[in-house]
A protein has these predicted regions:
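Extended, compositionally biased flexible segments
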Residues: 1-101
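Catalytic-pocket segment enriched in acidic/His residues
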Residues: 2-21, 33, 37-46, 105, ...
Length: 227
């Protein structure tokens, strides 16, 4: 068999302490999973549970640079804990969900906020705001076997040395296992899936030249420069 044209490259992430790479299949994202962030975005976390959307695997950015995208004048940072799956399935039981996690990483859900506001008013999907090129800078993956499954610990993001986002993983409305279990009732999960678990309050705009430093306690640090 021959391909009609060369197949697309397989997006991967490095694994700490290994020469192996983690092949990425899909990137799922959780919205409104920290109450204070839901409020700052104009939603009631007690009435509106988190929901899911996707980025494309080729949205990964691993160069340490985030190219400021076109068609926008208002790009925001959102720091997140990322869960990387090595096992999949459907209707996964909550008490077995964490057994599917290979490891964790630090990620940024970069967002064209002005475009998001526009499509929200029209009741349309968010892809143009969330799934543009290089919109998902993600760090190396650290094995769950090495650090366990983080359920608490500081999560923060600084821009040019000044803290903008600061929270704790314990503030997540839906915990990682609950996210996996619920998501598996909507989609068939598979090895290579990434789940971005939501962002704490303090999101804000970035500009060319900004240096972003995101940290999740016990997982690692991601440094990105906006170019």
């Amino acid at each position: 068999m021959a391909y009609a044209f060369p197949p697309a490259w397989i997006p991967t992430l490095p694994i700490r302490g290994s020469s192996d790479e983690f092949p990425v299949r899909r990137i799922y994202c959780v919205g409104r999973n920290y109450a204070e962030h839901a409020v700052e975005m104009g939603h009631d976390p007690d009435k509106e549970p988190p929901f899911f959307f996707q980025k494309n695997p080729d949205n990964l950015a691993q160069t340490g640079e985030f190219p400021y995208p076109g068609a926008t004048k208002d790009v925001h940072h959102e720091i997140e804990l990322v869960a990387a799956l090595s096992k999949g399935g459907t209707d996964i039981a909550p008490d077995a969900a964490l057994d599917h996690v290979f490891g964790y990483a630090v990620g940024l859900d970069m967002t064209r906020r002005d475009l998001q506001a526009g499509v929200k008013k029209l009741g349309r999907p968010w892809e143009i705001a969330k799934a543009f090129e290089k919109s998902a800078p993600i760090s190396e993956i650290v094995l769950a076997s090495a650090i366990g499954h983080p359920s608490s610990g500081a999560i923060s993001l600084a821009v040019n040395g000044k803290t903008r986002q600061s929270g704790d993983l314990s503030q997540m409305i839906w915990k990682t296992g609950e996210i996996i279990a619920h998501l598996s009732g909507l989609f068939e999960l598979a090895p290579g899936d990434l789940i971005m678990t939501g962002t704490p309050a303090g999101v804000g705009a970035v500009a060319r030249g900004d240096r972003l430093e995101g940290t999740v306690e016990g997982v690692g640090t991601l440094v990105v420069t906006v170019v």
